Amino acid sequence: MLNIFNLICICFNSALFSSTFLVAKLPEAYAFLNPIVDVMPVIPLFFLLLAFVWQAAVSFR
């Protein structure tokens, strides 16, 4: 049980400190990709929503 708690704490701390990457800038050559990079963290949520839509389409069998 303690190991699971430690793992959760490590993940939570890394998520907090990884927010510093949000202020990082892309190199000038890739500046045109900024809008795509801003949306990329949300993409996994689209797959989660797709799963619910798919299950609704098949009547939650």
From Swiss-Prot:
Q: Where are the transmembrane segments?
A: 40-60
The protein's matches in InterPro entries, at most eight in alphabetical order, are given as: PSII_PsbK, PSII_PsbK_sf
Which branch of life, at top level?
Eukaryota
* One GO process term, biological-process aspect: photosynthesis
- Mind telling me which GO cellular component terms the entry cites? chloroplast thylakoid membrane; photosystem II reaction center
Q: Which stretches of the sequence are propeptide?
A: 1-24
Keyword annotations for this protein, in alphabetical order, are: Chloroplast, Membrane, Photosynthesis, Photosystem II, Plastid, Reaction center, Thylakoid, Transmembrane, Transmembrane helix
Topology relative to the membrane, per the entry?
Single-pass membrane protein
**Cellular compartments annotated:** Plastid, Chloroplast thylakoid membrane
Taken from the record, one Pfam family name reads PsbK
Family recorded in the similarity comment: Belongs to the PsbK family.
State what this protein does.
One of the components of the core complex of photosystem II (PSII). PSII is a light-driven water:plastoquinone oxidoreductase that uses light energy to abstract electrons from H(2)O, generating O(2) and a proton gradient subsequently used for ATP formation. It consists of a core antenna complex that captures photons, and an electron transfer chain that converts photonic excitation into a charge separation.
Subunit-level organization? PSII is composed of 1 copy each of membrane proteins PsbA, PsbB, PsbC, PsbD, PsbE, PsbF, PsbH, PsbI, PsbJ, PsbK, PsbL, PsbM, PsbT, PsbX, PsbY, PsbZ, Psb30/Ycf12, at least 3 peripheral proteins of the oxygen-evolving complex and a large number of cofactors. It forms dimeric complexes.
Fetch the PANTHER family from UniProt.
PHOTOSYSTEM II REACTION CENTER PROTEIN K, PTHR35325
Q: What is this protein called?
A: Photosystem II reaction center protein K
Q: What is the scientific name of the source organism? A: Sinapis alba (White mustard)
